[in-house]
Each structure stands twice: as structure tokens, then as C-alpha cells.
Amino acid sequence: FLDASYEIADKVEMIHPARFLFNAGSTPKAWNEKMLSDPNFKVLDYEADASKLFHDTDIKGGVVISYHDRTKTFGAIQVFTKYKELNAIRNKVWASSTESIMEIIYIQNRFNLTNLYRKHPECKSGIGSDGRDSRFEKNIFVKIPLFQEEKEDNSIRTLGIYNGKRTWRYIDSEYVDIDHENLKKYKVVIPAANGSGEFGQTLSTPVIEMPMEAYTRSFIGIGAFNTKEEATALLKYIKSKFLRAMLSVLKVTQMTNKDVWKYVPLQDFTAHSDIDWSKSVVEIDRQLYRKYDLTADEIEFIE
């Protein structure tokens, strides 16, 4: 609709959903990036709570009044944030950061379909894409009865959702792809749908998973560590206000998919880190503020 309006007028002012400004939502990523790179496009006003403008309406990610002028150059937005303070913090953090935590984020575990169908061909009807999708989907505990409540020898404990509740089930390791990136490692698992997208919102109930523990599409896994101590350090980082602020650069809906973690800097979670992970989360926040040379005003904004 926006593209069509730009074809028929030099100057276009619109009010519309804002999720694409954060490279989120259902619009194609290529289109999002095109809009954010358009020097003729700018934001006049942004409102995170759409119900303030459209009563009794919930528009995830808020709404924006945008202006496009083919005859003027405003400069590309590139990265849009709700707050000018957050954009300044992002610029400062990424002036010295080179790696994002998204590099250690992994999607759900997978079946070994060859082994599964050899012994249980009837399971093919419960697998997506006509039996070709090997991933542990959200409803897999219902679709595949091989996930059991009781643990048996060589079974893999799997975290998922059953009847709307977080649940652990067990499946024989023979039916699982054991080459998944973090199956044999320590990791932190969090719900894929988490909160509402409000700034700095606490991420609900992250848990540490041990080696040979898995998770369904209802969750994402962060890390692939050799030691539990590293996973514990990551868990503290996830609970920090600093991380939650950096996550808010792109997280404006409930989804915590890999892409929204782009501006969260990766840390060294070992004992050799420049952060002392043995400290409390409050003290870890202070260390992170010092590491990135944040001002008193920037710290107050995050806090």
C-alpha cells in the first residue's frame, strides 16, 4: 500500500503499523530494509501503545505517522528505536562490539527421520511438510506419541508445551538428531514468545538445560557451552537490565526470534571474561555500564 502511494504522489503522509521499522512483523525483510534505507522516508511520530490512538485496538509494535517526499532527502533511518537515548546507547555499545549474541542462538531440536520412520512409519502423518519437516514443532507432544512422561534408558528430556503448560517429556535418543548444534552442550532456554515488547521487560522463566536435553519450537536455545558455569553466567546476563535494554532495540512484539537479538553484544562467559560473573545481577549490570562507558543519564534511562 505504501509502495503504491509513493508511485502516485511526490508527498505522502500515512499512519500505519510500525513493526517493520524494527525489521519485525510479517512484511518481507527485504522490504523492511528498503524502507529503512530510503533517504526520502522519515518518521514524524511514533506511538508504542496503539490503543491511545485507536481505542480498543491492540497493534503489536505500535503505530507510526510516516512521511515520504520524493523531492527531499532526509537521510536513511537505518536503525529505528523508540527512544533517542536507546539509539545513543546502541551506537556507543557497538562502537566497541563486533559480535552479537544472535551468533549463539539455536532453533529447536530435530528428529532423525530415517530412524523414526524405520520403526514407526505411522508417525509420518504427524510430521509437517508431508513427513519431511524434522523439527520439534510446538504441538509435537500431541502429534507424536513417542514423547512419554516417564524416563527410560537412553531417553532425551525435552522441554515443550502441553495443554498450555510448560512440560517435560522423554523420547528415545535413537529418534533424535544428535548432531543438533547444542544438544550435547549446556545452554539457556527461554520461551520463543516472551512478554509484550515493552522496553526493558523481564524475560520470563529462562532455564539452564543440561547436555542431552532438548526443546521444541515453543523455545529458543542460547549457547552451546562445555561447562555449566558458562551457562550460569549467560543466565545472569539474560536477567540483566543492560541486556534487556539492548534487546529492546528490535524487540517490539512478544516474539524473541533470533533476529531481534542482533544488537545484544556477545560476552565471554568463561572465568577469563572481563566481567566477573560470580557477582549478583545488579553488580553485573554495573560492570557492563562501566565496560561500555555509559553516562549517568544513560544508566538512569536503562534503570
Where is each model-derived feature located?
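Conserved Class I SAM-dependent methyltransferase catalytic core
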Residues: F1-K52, V64-H68, L234
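Short, amphipathic C-terminal "tail helix"
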Residues: D297-E303
